[in-house]
Amino acid sequence: LERTFQTEYNFYSSNKDNNYIPKLYKYDDSKKDSEFIYEIIEKLEGNTLYYYWYKMDESERENTIKNLMEIIKKFHSKKPEGYNWASKIKNEVLSDLEECKDSFSSKEYDIIIKSINNYDLFLKDNRFALIHNDLHFDNIIYNNGILKIIDFNDSLIAPIDFEFRQLYSCQEKPWKYANIEMDPFQKPHDYKNIWNYIKQYYEELNDIKYLEQRMLIYNVWNSIRNLKKY
């Protein structure tokens, strides 16, 4: 838990002049006033984007994603050193797969193992940035057309396309990250254009080789990771 506070603080420190995140009023890891590390942040008006998306017409949805991409591009404007991304994803998939191996048939297991042989090729073209890393509608606050982003405790340095894996998955399972109240209102047909809007307004994504294959790899990575948890 303390590590996540530090991760979130690092993100705030890297985005001090960003008006699309809550203000960080105080961060204290000294444990002088309390036995815990704590932070005090701005309370935002509005509600998560899940409460509004299903009510929007398609023009409003497109404009919302356009505005969101401008915010995310600002997050991604800092360009850190990269690392062997393919190796990281391969190792994590293999490790998680081994832990939940019994959940797969031998045929399914073999398909996943064989697909990993392509990771070096598909995950070679990388543009690294400090990403939010948990970007879904429950972490996007909407208030009178204004968007703000919350919850930075999973942020990390990674390729920019990895940022959008959850929004990509909304095309098929839009309810996945919604709360119990909003879950029933999330329908795939309301998300059918979300990926196209993302690519339209974050132009650099279109320059990444094997983008669609990469998103499928991230889906495998995410699914096996969640299977291991639950």
Identify the role of each PLM range.
Residues 145-150, 168:
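Basic, amphipathic juxtamembrane/active-site segments
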Residues 32, 48, 140, 157-159:
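Conserved protein kinase catalytic core
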Residues 29-32, 39, 60-61, 66, ...:
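An alpha-helical support segment within catalytic cores of ATP-dependent transferases
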Residues 151-155:
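Activation of the activation-loop gatekeeper triad in protein kinase-fold domains
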Residues 57-58, 92-93, 165-167:
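Glycine-rich, phosphate-binding/catalytic loops in enzymes
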Residues 204-215:
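Short, surface-exposed acidic
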Residues 162-205, 219-230:
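Active-site activation/catalytic loop segments of kinase-like enzymes and analogous catalytic loops
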Residues 1-84:
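ATP-binding pocket architecture of kinase catalytic cores
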